[in-house]
Amino acid sequence: MAYTYRFIDTNENIIYVGYTAQTMAKRIGQHFTKGHLPKKCYKSIQRIEYIKWETKSDAQVMEVFYINKYHPRYNRLDHQNDHLNIQVADEKEWEVYQVIKKPNIKYEAENGVLTWIMWGALAYAIFEFLFLSR
């Protein structure tokens, strides 16, 4: 038994693809204790998904396939552009292994407009309290 897994960030980008012949728990634990990827990668993970394969060779081939398909930011270039002349007839479904963060919901406005509105409202509330409430 072996696995191909991927890290997905809060913006739904696939940022890393890997494979393992270990249990998912052991491999993911290694990533988060002595991982080889930048800390920025691990901090941006929203969830981890995987596909189970019958053999280690299947998982390795599919790792290269998915790296070439998705071009994840944190995969090394030596795996990319390894041209595979295979056809994947029936792609398996990815299963969620672990959710690290809730999906990113953005409330930010461009150029800090929301920040200016909040500061303006605070300033007006202080002004009203100090000068108009008398």
Region spans (language model):
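Structure-specific nucleic-acid interaction/processing domains
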Residues: 1-15, 21-104
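C-terminal single-pass membrane-anchor helix
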Residues: 102-134
